[in-house]
Amino acid sequence: MEFAEFAARAAEIESEPADLETVDLVATLCADAGDDLGTVARFVQGRVFPAHDSTKLDIGPSLCYEALAKAAGPNVDSDDIERRLAEVGEIGAVAESLDLGGQQGLAAFGGGTDREALTVSGVEETLQALAAAAGDGSTDAKRDRLFDLFNRAEPTEARFLARLVLGEMRVGVGEGTVRDAIAAAFEVPEPDVERALQVANDCGLVAETARDDGAAGLDDIGLVVGRPVKAMLAQAGTAVEALDEWGTAAVETKYDGARVQVHYDGDSARLFSRNLEEVTEPLPEVVEFVEQSLSVPAILDGEVVAVDDDGTPRPFQEILRRFRRKHDVAAAREDVSVELYAFDCLHVDGEDLLDTPLSERHDRLESLLADGVSPLSYADDADEVADIEADALDAGHEGIMLKNPDSTYTPGSRGKNWLKRKPDVETLDLVVTGAEWGEGRRANLLGTFVVSARADDGYEPVGKVATGITDEELERLHERLQPHVRTEDGTDVDIEPAVVFEVGYEEIQQSPTYGSGYALRFPRFVGVREDKSPSDADSLERIDRLTS
């Protein structure tokens, strides 16, 4: 498929406000994609790689602006791009407005006056090469490859190419739309597509399988050791709710650590974060433990916790120091010890256990590991739950989890089968989408942060956070967010959604101040959720539930 055809279809999808018609348009796009089906299914969501693949393009706004300016000719520079961006508000519109192709005569790209048409597969290959570029000269190489794409792009192509490069397709298509479109395009049941997406974590693979092998092929898609899936999630709840619903509750400790998914292929282990980033290298002692303890291939779910020499848990920030460490891991290991608490078993020796009840999955887990298994207790009344919770808190842990003993494991879902019960202040995980410059001694730092919840198509602000941040933390946050700054207008700064804050609050109020309709009362910075991406942040739907 030529990229011009994809861009034209994407423009049509963007202009369609109705959800059902959008699904139909995406379904038609998938049906017409031919050999590019897998790529098209990802591109329309703004993805270059499958969801399970943590490979990143590593192209920031500045590099994109430079490539665009170069393709626009000698009379345009990056500052011009940023000025236009401030005027129109999004990079796609800027790219579309430029007269690209002004540098075709450059010898580096063969000269000539005819533009070689972009294709979907060609764009994918170039972006994959961009992601693989590393070492000295890689920045220049990325800029030149990106320039070549923009230099060959027609206006509509440039709009969606720029958005794709920065991961912001802005056409209102998410995983749910693609799921429904695959089902419609290839006449397979939507629940079958949903299950396959949960297991494969790759919409391209699922789309191709649905087209080529139908429902039977989707049913054959299983877990693969080394291919991570999204973690099953919990929502807030009470012991009374759990016992009323289930009769008996499975109760386990809620650790103040970081979620990990363990993949062991029979020889070596790999670890993945909740965000599906590989964290094998920073956690060698966990890898060693798994490789010494397991005798058959398996996929486990668990938590890695920083501990003192006596096993007492250390603060959450300590484990994040280990997750972020890429160099001198041995020294970090000496400084901060970690332990694995496995609490679920998804796959054992070729057998998927997603549809197996929790109680049985935990039994299988205990048969695999002699140590490192999070204990699972069963309670029939609220007093028993309270006793277990007290023991967990006395041991220095965060609280408890309540789980339905009969529940299956549904990757990526947040439902009533897992409930988290914490005694601490209520918090939300929110995306930083803006900031304001500080005052006084903080005048050279971003000092107040706009935090937003996930919405149907983007993010909606629910408050501003300035309290709870030390001067040292503020400097770190400033450095962390500076590469994601899009535009500035006076003291107001627009920030690309990339960093998730955990924000404490006293109350959620209805308010006309923000487009979300809500405002946090007394919001307070708790920390950065290094284990979460913007797509994992709390949604407006959850805030609706909390306020109802």
From Swiss-Prot:
Job of this protein: DNA ligase that seals nicks in double-stranded DNA during DNA replication, DNA recombination and DNA repair.
Catalytic activity line of the entry: ATP + (deoxyribonucleotide)n-3'-hydroxyl + 5'-phospho-(deoxyribonucleotide)m = (deoxyribonucleotide)n+m + AMP + diphosphate
Organism field: Natronomonas pharaonis (strain ATCC 35678 / DSM 2160 / CIP 103997 / JCM 8858 / NBRC 14720 / NCIMB 2260 / Gabara) (Halobacterium pharaonis)
Entries under PANTHER family matching the protein: DNA LIGASE, DNA LIGASE 1/3 FAMILY MEMBER
Family affiliation: Belongs to the ATP-dependent DNA ligase family.
Keyword Cell membrane: no
Biological-process GO terms, alphabetical: cell division; DNA biosynthetic process; DNA recombination; DNA repair; lagging strand elongation
Key words of the record: ATP-binding, Cell cycle, Cell division, DNA damage, DNA recombination, DNA repair, DNA replication, Ligase, Magnesium, Metal-binding, Nucleotide-binding
Annotated catalytic residues: 254
Pfam families: DNA_ligase_A_C (PF04679), DNA_ligase_A_M (PF01068), DNA_ligase_A_N (PF04675)
Enzyme Commission number(s): 6.5.1.1
Enzyme class: ligase
Source superkingdom: Archaea
CDD domains linked to this entry: Adenylation_DNA_ligase_Arch_LigB (cd07901), OBF_DNA_ligase_Arch_LigB (cd07972)
Cofactor annotation: Mg(2+)
Binding site for ATP: 252, 259, 274, 303, 343, 414, 420
InterPro entries listed in its UniProt record: ATP-dep_DNA_ligase, DNA_ligae_ATP-dep_bac/arc, DNA_ligase_ATP-dep, DNA_ligase_ATP-dep_C, DNA_ligase_ATP-dep_cent, DNA_ligase_ATP-dep_CS, DNA_ligase_ATP-dep_N, DNA_ligase_N_sf
Classification via Gene3D superfamilies: DNA ligase, ATP-dependent, N-terminal domain, DNA ligase/mRNA capping enzyme, Nucleic acid-binding proteins
GO molecular function: ATP binding; DNA binding; DNA ligase (ATP) activity; metal ion binding
SUPFAM superfamilies named in the record: ATP-dependent DNA ligase DNA-binding domain (SSF117018), DNA ligase/mRNA capping enzyme, catalytic domain (SSF56091), Nucleic acid-binding proteins (SSF50249)
Record's protein name: DNA ligase
